[in-house]
């Protein structure tokens, strides 16, 4: 897909920078140079998708395949709502500016990046496929891909997202003996899976204390914790007791809390569990710390986006706070003021799959073009 994006940028007459992040994964940066003297604006979007479409539960759904089709004014296909539709809007916004002969003072760039999806390497899950959480944008900003401001076209229902939560991933483990079933009589309570039952009950007691803590709230939204996975034993060899069982949590952290503080707090909880169940061999590991991001309501980018949205839709856009992660996490830490603003997340259709309304894409592209004029200034 990166190759297709590069070809598109070349056809548009953009200055193109190919960033080979690793084998099989690249960022593509297209730059429309300005006349000088104006702020620069980046449109950032990720090339990777949440799914491949080959998953058994998706393989039969046409809208989750990498083959587009149009039906009833809606465009279907893998990744259209998250967020390949936004990438198309960026391209058409710059094409519209070129067709209209609009020259801007500041540079406008489109950054098509890899490795944004919320996933990471852990255990046997190793390799490029599992390197996410802004891996591409982290490479981008350290290799020349910087601007004064950035619009991220994540699916926000055309709302201006002034901030989003970060994510902390935690592993909690229990241990037990590894013995043959025949010799396990009287030792069921030592089984690491059985021991994890105590831990899970205690974690479920702890979760509301995290979610209800005012310190963990942001912009009217509460924090949230997902009990995401449990791994223990060997399905191919259940003649042995499991020597270790792992529980995995996704703990959402407000952008106002330092990740080091969040890490300290969740590990204190784990230490409490170890003290409560000393025979369980409990240990904890924090293996993702992806901070949230925010932008001030009075930042010039918000004013520029408000004006553009109002011109297209006839009303000021609503505000929102989300608990999903975006590459704003990295961009803001490089001094790039970043806001999430994009299309609908799509009409939920479990039969036909991922989709977006074409008219909505056209209007969003116009908002982006007008926002670029407002930010970068017409020469």
Named regions from a protein language model:
Residues 22-27, 157, 324-327:
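Short acidic loop-to-helix transition motifs that present clustered carboxylates
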Residues 38-112, 118-120, 352:
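Active-site metal-coordination/substrate-binding segment of hydrolases
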Residues 54-71, 163-174, 304-308, 339:
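Acidic-glycine-rich active-site phosphate/pyrophosphate-binding loop
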Residues 44-46, 111-113, 151-154, 173, ...:
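Short beta-strand segments
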Residues 83-165:
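Acidic/histidine-rich catalytic neighborhood of metal-dependent amide-processing enzymes
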Residues 1, 17, 171-379:
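Metal-dependent amide/peptide-bond hydrolase catalytic core
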Residues 1-59, 244-248, 262-268:
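N-terminal helical capping/dimerization or prosegment-like subdomains
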